[in-house]
């Protein structure tokens, strides 16, 4: 990573890290509030969980680079690290990651074939559950949860607890549109939400999720960074920190100890 950092700095090219959690509309609003109030972030909790990936290679280390921690945990982790960067800039402080502790496992291994029918995850040599505890240099904390064992759709959020505010960023699901259906007639081509096998009963429908989840803001920021020759909001420093934390987390889980920086 340090060699890559050298290349980026020497070439003067723009490195754009596609972390949609940074650009998710509730996270962007939370960042605005944190900067305005100069909030000290004491504890954050973020999660991305679902019933497993639709990718046939998600369960293979040599195809994916890890399990649910790598596939989904990077998103809330990256979002929380970015928020910590916003806090540091607003308060004119330098805040770094001090230590990482992690536990991973394969919770679905205990299921019979019939019991497994609702869970898509098929881990071979990767984890289907992971939790990371991060301690920052100012003594504050962040907790990241990632799991392939959660039914009911995709669960994405960041909870923020500071000295002068509490902010809950609900990315998915949201309450913009709650739907109730007794049947699915006429709904064959209507998308309600992700990772739900049926549309019956009450559901929390996706409404402009490409905007709320940050995909549009991400692309707009990257294009404007090129057009106006400025740095993107999500760049190399965030990619570097996120990768460092994720790999330290795997080392922590493997060795059964806290990793200090």
Located regions from the model:
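C-terminal helix-rich "cap/oligomerization" subdomain common to oxidoreductases
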Residues: 5, 10, 186-187, 207-208, ...
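Mobile, glycine-enriched helix-loop/loop "lid" segments at the mouths of ligand-binding/catalytic clefts
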Residues: 45-47, 103, 173-198
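Residue-level signal for the nucleotide or nucleotide-sugar donor/cofactor binding architecture
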Residues: 25, 71, 155, 214-217, ...
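Contiguous beta-strand/loop segments that form the cofactor/metal-binding neighborhood of enzyme cores
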Residues: 78-181, 216-229, 248
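Predominantly a Rossmann-like dinucleotide-binding segment in NAD(P)-dependent oxidoreductases
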Residues: 11-16, 21-123, 256
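C-terminal "lid/loop" region of Rossmann-like NAD(P)-dependent oxidoreductases
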Residues: 194-210
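A short glycine-threonine-serine/GTX helix/turn-capping micro-motif
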Residues: 64-71, 205-213
